[in-house]
Amino acid sequence: MNRSCAMKSCVLILLLALLCAERAQGLNCYNCTMIPFGNTCSSTATCPYPDGVCTIQVAEVVVSSVRLKVKSNLCLPGCPKSPQTPEVLGTVVHVNTDCCNTDLCNAAGPTGGSTWTMAGVLLFILGSVLLQTLL
């Protein structure tokens, strides 16, 4: 019995160490700059920043009633605030940024929220209502 308990403890400690260990290799991100929105980025790179994040930035500008929209898939040292509206040569540029921290997670463009996020929020609300009803 004592040996079985020690074995279970060793396995538990090993699992915890694996879960808490930092990744040995850096974060992999898609890496493309200023490509037309709608085009796919296929180039990848290992993020050089220890606490870096993968990002996708979509920049949009209207010049003489012509709308230009480009995107960049990058690794950055941190997640910039979004949205941003810098002014370049007297023209306002709208920039939206999404950040993530898993390998190749910056493939898609910024969205209004994922279906899974909305489903999670809905389940949380329903669970809260049910819990209040039971109490």
Curated annotation (Swiss-Prot):
Positions of the UPAR/Ly6 domain: 27-119
Propeptide: 114-135
InterPro entries per record: LY6_UPA_recep-like, LY6H/LY6L_nAChR_modulators, Snake_toxin-like_sf
Transmembrane residue ranges: none
Gene of this entry: Ly6b
Protein's GO biological process: acetylcholine receptor signaling pathway
Protein name: Lymphocyte antigen 6B
Signal peptide: 1-26
CDD domains named in the record: TFP_LU_ECD_Ly6A_like
The entry's keywords: Cell membrane, Disulfide bond, Glycoprotein, GPI-anchor, Lipoprotein, Membrane, Signal
GO CC terms in record: plasma membrane; side of membrane; synapse
SMART domains, per the entry: LU (SM00134)
Topology relative to the membrane: Lipid-anchor; GPI-anchor
